[in-house]
Amino acid sequence: MSSVRRRVLLAALVASVMASPEAAMAIEQPEYTVVRQDGAFELRRYAPYLLAETEVESGFMEAGNVAFGRLFRYISGDNTARTEIAMTAPVEQAKRGGGEKIAMTAPVEQAREGGVYRVAFVVPRKYDRDTVPQPTDPRVRIREVPARSIAVWRYSGRWTEENFREHERELRGKLAALGLKAEPGDSAIIARYDAPFMPWFMRRNEVLIPVTEPAASARPAP
């Protein structure tokens, strides 16, 4: 699939479910509770959820483009049930190994230039391991993410690696100040929640880093 066609598919899909801020808010996302919040920083406790993910060996941006085409075909009926699966957020992407990772329901997640990237869509909660349609493309797999604590840094702006890395540094600085430790082997994830035609200054982007700190004294997410 050409890069032009992938961009058209991405725009058409996201436009159909995120045509307005109200629609974007209605997109299903993984369940979580907020443990701590301070400006752009949050510590969240996520419930278990399923991902449809694929790996691409390429640069930061191209990996996301290639992976999106595979995952889009999966939720469009390229699965054993031949059924369409609802769009979720975010789309997650992260670099495999090297202490960095990524995951899609309402953001798109992604991590560092050059290497193997994992890009994923979040599977709607109505499915479990036994009922989720299985991919027919062997490059796409279903993976269960266990309950875990995630440190989050929210930001707006363009989906460049430079922008992502700048805010990753801010998040890691916050973790050091709080005495929180990243999970061994986990990469920083970029989570993207908005359509590409959303003005860059209005986009919701997040850096996600799994941490070992137990999530206590949680309150429900808004």
What are these regions (language model features)?
Residues S2-P222:
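A solvent-exposed interaction/effector surface
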